Every structure is written in structure tokens, then in C-alpha cells.
């Protein structure tokens, strides 16, 4: 019996930014969406956000009715809304790489990147890419890149 397509992986983006708030709001509209999960630190979610920590993306669909499925990726230090922390840079980059690996393995059907703070990544980890698109191309071993935006 098929369990349906793999869920979509959401990267947390910059914890001090709007990414975790977007993910929390998306959970409230979950009936309109295919299964998804957030990769990040559940401590960074807005206060009161229902969530379920999952060990693997295969648990996302079952967790989704009860709370935002979060594949735990612990960060050092606290989230300070509006104040990007260069100390979080390596963990943010690792979340993106983890999402790519899960997508390439088939554990996630796609990935959606939430906003990063490019200067914090450069200052904190020497991030050598102009943004997500070029880093994703690098991880996928591609030279040519295209960015797609969807506004609903």
C-alpha cells in the first residue's frame, strides 16, 4: 500500500527572521498543502506554535494534523527576533545541505527555502555564495541555475 509522495522539506532560514513564522502560519493552512516538515530548532518557533518533533520525514504526514512536524536540527544559542546571529551561520548552512540530501535521497519530494540573512552567513561562516540558488546549484553539482518564485 502506497503512503503517497514524500513530504516537502522546509529549511528554517535565519532563525531571527520571518522563516519560522512562515512555517508556523503554513501549518495553520495545512489542509491546503501536501505533507511538509520543517528542518530547524523547535525552540525557535513562535511561542505557542503546536509542533511535533519527528525523527524522519516519513513521520511528517502522521504528525501534521497534531502540530508542525519539525526534524530537529539544534542550534547553539537563542533566537532573538530581528537580530541575526552570525554564530548560527554554520547551522543554517547545514540545514540547507541536509534538506538537499533528503531530497536527493527521495526522503523529501522537494524543498522550500525560507529566507536567510546573507551577511550573517558570510560573516559567521564565510558563505561564498550570493544566495540560496547558487548554493543549491553547488550542492547539486550544477553550474546553470534558475530561481522560481511563486506568490499566491
Model region roles, listed by residue range:
Residues 1-135:
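Contiguous, glycine/small-aliphatic-enriched amphipathic segments in soluble metabolic enzymes
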Residues 130-152:
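Flexible loop/hinge segments that line or gate small-molecule binding clefts
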Amino acid at each position: 500500500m502506497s503512503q503517497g509522495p514524500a513530504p516537502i522539506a522546509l529549511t528554517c532560514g535565519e532563525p531571527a527572521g520571518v522563516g519560522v513564522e512562515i512555517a508556523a502560519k503554513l501549518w495553520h493552512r495545512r489542509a491546503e498543502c501536501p505533507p511538509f516538515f520543517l528542518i530547524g530548532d523547535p525552540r525557535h518557533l513562535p511561542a505557542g506554535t503546536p509542533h511535533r518533533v519527528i525523527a524522519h520525514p516519513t513521520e511528517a504526514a502522521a504528525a501534521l494534523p497534531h502540530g508542525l512536524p519539525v526534524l530537529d536540527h539544534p542550534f547553539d544559542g537563542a533566537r532573538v527576533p530581528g537580530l541575526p546571529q552570525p554564530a548560527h551561520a554554520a547551522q543554517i548552512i547545514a540545514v540547507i545541505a541536509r534538506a538537499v540530501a533528503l531530497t536527493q535521497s527521495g526522503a523529501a519530494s522537494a524543498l522550500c527555502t525560507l529566507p536567510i540573512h546573507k551577511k550573517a552567513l558570510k560573516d559567521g561562516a564565510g558563505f561564498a555564495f550570493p544566495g540560496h540558488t547558487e548554493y543549491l546549484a553547488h550542492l547539486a553539482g550544477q553550474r546553470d541555475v534558475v530561481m522560481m518564485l511563486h506568490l499566491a
